A protein has these predicted regions:
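Exposed extracellular interaction/assembly regions and N-terminal maturation sites
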Residues: 5-75, 102-109
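Short edge-strand/loop segments of extracellular domains
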Residues: 74-82
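Low-complexity acidic/polar repeat-biased segments
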Residues: 88-109
Length: 109
């Protein structure tokens, strides 16, 4: 398997209903699975992903502050098989991250 790819697994375990929306007005936010975080702070915000996610856990992040410096912090888990945080460098970005496994970590869906 190549980095950034994954084989089929049941990722549908947390698909019941819509995510709970949380308006972020601070520079830091600890994320919970099943939540959508809308970044509205005048300064860049960092959303830190859960430290011990289960396969199928998901987090939405939506940029609403028109900045290109907001960050999704990996909190010890990979994002798309990379051991690095993700900068949301689009002022209109909206991303969903779903946890796959310990090797791949969080994937963009």
């Amino acid at each position: 398997m190549n980095p950034g790819t994954f084989a089929g697994t049941n990722f549908g375990t947390n698909l019941s209903g819509s995510p709970t929306m949380n308006i972020v007005t601070a520079t830091a936010q600890m994320a919970l699975s099943g939540y959508q975080y809308v970044l509205t702070n005048a300064s860049a915000s960092t959303v830190t992903l859960p430290a011990t996610p289960a396969p199928g856990d998901y987090v939405y992040v939506t940029v609403a502050n028109n900045l290109v410096t907001n960050t999704v912090a990996r909190n010890g888990n990979n994002i798309m098989s990379l051991a690095q945080d993700m900068t949301l460098d689009n002022p209109y970005a909206g991303v969903q991250l779903r946890y796959a496994n310990a090797t791949i970590g969080w994937v963009l869906t």
